[in-house]
């Protein structure tokens, strides 16, 4: 993949997250902000999730209270370089924990 393809895929990922949060109907207030390719989700309890694109590596990084994860794109999805877990599964798990209620980003 070249840099242009990477940015297109990362943009699609972040847009999907924004659209999902805009449609979230739970009790928790989850704010998001995107600045310079970094998306920060902020939860009512003050905790944060940070999603960051790493252009030189063509990776998307996810930082949660539980730890940091690096994702590579293959076969139409982003997968963790260590566990093989799919990005939206890991994001849903982390957001659910940090929001205190179910938050699903499943496609």
Swiss-Prot record:
Provide the gene name from the record: cyaY
Please give the SUPFAM superfamilies that the UniProt record associates with this protein.
Answer: Frataxin/Nqo15-like
What's this protein's name?
A: Iron-sulfur cluster assembly protein CyaY
GO terms for MF: ferric iron binding; ferrous iron binding
- One Pfam annotation reads Frataxin_Cyay
Query: What's the stated role of this polypeptide?
Result: Involved in iron-sulfur (Fe-S) cluster assembly. May act as a regulator of Fe-S biogenesis.
What is the species listed in this Swiss-Prot or TrEMBL entry?
Yersinia pseudotuberculosis serotype O:1b (strain IP 31758)
Keywords from UniProt, A to Z, are:
Iron, Metal-binding
| Lineage, uppermost ranks | Bacteria, Pseudomonadati, Pseudomonadota, Gammaproteobacteria, Enterobacterales
Q: Which GO terms describe its biological process?
A: iron-sulfur cluster assembly
Statement: the UniProt record of this protein carries the keyword DNA-binding: no
**The keyword Metal-binding belongs to this UniProt entry's keyword annotation:** yes
Q: Which GO terms describe its cellular component?
A: cytosol
């Amino acid at each position: 993949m070249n840099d242009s393809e990477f940015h297109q895929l990362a943009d699609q990922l972040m847009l999907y997250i924004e659209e999902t949060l805009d449609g979230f109907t739970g009790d928790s207030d989850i704010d998001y902000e995107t600045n310079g390719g970094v998306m920060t989700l902020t939860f009512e309890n003050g905790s944060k999730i940070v999603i960051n694109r790493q252009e030189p590596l063509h990776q998307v990084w996810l930082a949660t209270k539980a730890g940091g994860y690096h994702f590579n794109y293959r076969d139409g999805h982003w997968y963790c370089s260590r566990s093989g877990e799919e990005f939206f599964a890991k994001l849903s798990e982390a957001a659910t924990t940090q929001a205190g209620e179910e938050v699903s980003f499943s496609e």
